[in-house]
Design a protein with these regions (language model features):
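Motif I (Walker A/P-loop) of helicase-class P-loop NTPases
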Residues: 31-40, 142
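Walker A (P-loop) phosphate-binding loop of P-loop NTPases
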Residues: 28
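N-terminal pre-P-loop "Q-motif" helix
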Residues: 1-19, 33
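Conserved motor-coupling elements within RecA-like helicase/translocase cores
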Residues: 65-73, 77-101, 115
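Post-DEXD/H (motif II) to motif III coupling segment of the RecA-like Helicase ATP-binding lobe
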Residues: 117, 124-177
Length: 177
């Protein structure tokens, strides 16, 4: 369960090579705890993490769990923010003080210093596909970014996408726990 998932993420993170870990055996708050423990290791090593959650799941309670663990190091980005608030968060991230960025799909493009980990929670969610121009699938962009920046990518889902399951079967840099 949780221990195995955290160990697999730790190994992927330490490889610095864009490895992907699909976490599909842990549900509910257990999955969030896996993310939090993995992020703790990343932050301790001086690197940063981006955590993407579906817009509908980006609740004050979700943010509070991350702030409870990482305090003032947490930045939040979502579509309901005003321009000023978004700018302030962007600036906070760019400064390097924000080590944990929690947000919806667009948070993937935040100017994060020293990216060590990207987490996509509920990776099967349709909201991660951008249908208007420029079109992209968040998972694919995140996998590319992880490779480019020597980070690890974690995909969390109780119902993984067929694409993710296929990659686990056929790509040695992808594992499932």
């Amino acid at each position: 369960g949780q221990q195995r998932a955290v160990a697999a993420i730790s190994k992927a993170f330490q490889a610095h090579s864009g490895q992907v870990v699909l976490v599909d055996g842990v549900t509910g708050s257990g999955k969030t705890e896996v993310y939090l423990r993995a992020i703790e290791e990343v932050v301790r090593s001086g690197r940063s993490a981006i955590v993407l959650v579906p817009e509908i799941s980006l609740t004050p309670q979700t943010v509070a769990r991350f702030r409870g663990r990482f305090g003032d190091m947490v930045a939040v980005l979502h579509s309901r923010m005003g321009t000023g608030e978004r700018f302030d968060q962007w600036d906070f991230i760019r400064s390097g003080e924000a080590r944990v960025i929690v947000g919806a799909r667009s948070a993937l493009f935040a100017p994060v210093a020293d990216l060590g980990l990207i987490v996509i929670d509920e990776e099967h969610e349709a909201s991660y596909k951008q249908d208007s121009a420029p079109r992209y699938v968040t998972r694919d962009v995140a996998a590319w970014m992880a490779r480019e920046r020597g980070a690890a990518l974690v995909l969390g889902s109780a119902t993984p996408s067929i694409e993710a399951l296929f990659r686990v079967q056929h790509d040695p840099t992808w594992t499932a726990v």
